[in-house]
Swiss-Prot record:
Protein name from the UniProt record: Replicative DNA helicase DnaB
Species name: Rickettsia typhi (strain ATCC VR-144 / Wilmington)
InterPro entries xref list: DNA_heli_DnaB-like_N_sf (IPR036185), DNA_helicase_DnaB (IPR007692), DNA_helicase_DnaB-like_C (IPR007694), DNA_helicase_DnaB-like_N (IPR007693), DNA_helicase_N/primase_C (IPR016136), P-loop_NTPase (IPR027417)
GO cellular component: cytosol; primosome complex
Domain SF4 helicase: 198-490
NCBIfam families attached to this UniProt entry: DnaB, PRK09165.1
Pfam families, A to Z: DnaB, DnaB_C
Originating gene: dnaB
Amino acid sequence: MVRNKINNNINIITNNDDNLSIPRVLPSNIQAEQMLLGAIITNNELLSYVSEFLRNEHFFEPIHQKIYDAIEKIIEKGLIATPITLRSMLTQDALFQEIEGVEYLAKLITMSMMVINPIDYGKIIYDLAIKRNLINIGEEVVNNAYNASLAVAAKEQIEHAEAKLYDLAREGLNEKSFTQVGISIAESLASINKAMKNNDHVIGISTGLLDLDNKLFGFHNSDLIILAGRPSMGKTAFAINLALNTCNNMRLKNIRDNQEIKSVGFFSLEMSSEQLTTRLLSLCAEIDSTSLRTGMLSEEKYNRLRKEANTLSELQFFIDDTPALSISAIRTRARRMKRKHNLGILFIDYLQLIRGVSKSENRVNEISEITQGLKAIAKELNIPVIALSQLSRAVELREDKKPMLSDLRESGTIEQDADIVMFIYREEYYLTRKEPAAGDAKHAEWLDKLNKVYNIADIIIAKHRNGPVGNISLYYDSQFSKFGNLEKRTFNSILNT
């Protein structure tokens, strides 16, 4: 009688060859579920071995989901899950009453006598649940494709499907348990030994800028780095310089260590790929962007441009200029790039142009979702993520224009989620807009101040979770949007560092 009460869920699948509807039973193993539950009721300690990966929704039978959930709750209360305690918890449940629950629990215990390794049964149940989820995703993809409005692009649906499949593939893989401290110490010692052998002590990805590396020790895997600044400070230009430097430095290191070459990903949500590439060419060939756009080039400059273009073309540098991407789309594309091109570092220009997944009217909540998503990408893909950010207009209302953490737009969540927060600030930009009249007595004083900050960009490290904060100064050539070490004798071509 009890067995007849257990349901079999059936899917109707259409055969494309003859248009016949063929009923197919969803994959499950009722007996494995019964034997595992019986074994846990008999020996509650077994729950600890399967609860790390097995949840109640992984069971196919609804009554088995209820029994497993009840077992977990009883044990969490410090009690023993027995037929008696389970009965007291489930006695009011309609399904438990329908299948004559007390008799059914006795049957489960009887069946458990044949169990040799309960963990194997748990893995069977888990694997079948994943297959059912895969079927559900497939049905959802088909239904969405049939029912989607013209406003929903096919590419967006593909990314949604890919994200669902990727999440399903990783289900259970990220559920880490405790690590014995000896293992963690061994990993730490390995990192320390590696750093000791490195003469410049840059243990992350080198930025190519000496003073910045001395502060940050390079960009580190799983870190979220926020680079913020007011308009015209040069944050996009700085990001392009960093992307180019890290791309070249990763390549050299990978070749030296005989490893697969890592790539740079650059999400340009504001600037087109062509505009970004023009900046790269201007930077490397040292030809101003205006000359490149107008085509007013001498033969010598054009030959130099072709040479740098050929060098750039060989780099593992990838640009995505799709506007208004959602955080889920960025995650999906970054995952894809990790699989296909061994993504080593990711740049995003800029944070406020990313759409959240949930439709929140509260921008602070949406930014929180985005920054948490970016940090999750950094951890999941084990790469540094550098996201550019705007600053509030409050900076312009102060006499001292140097930015502070409180100037970050929707600052609370950005500051909280970031491992490093850097500001770019150029005093030269503000001074040039305050030039006194030529004959004015203050003009000489103004000129002296301007000379001290000419071609200098300050990088203010306002937050550094694992290191010192402070300011550094960099050389900045606005004509070519080029950053380098402050002492010009150490300022070489980006591609030749």
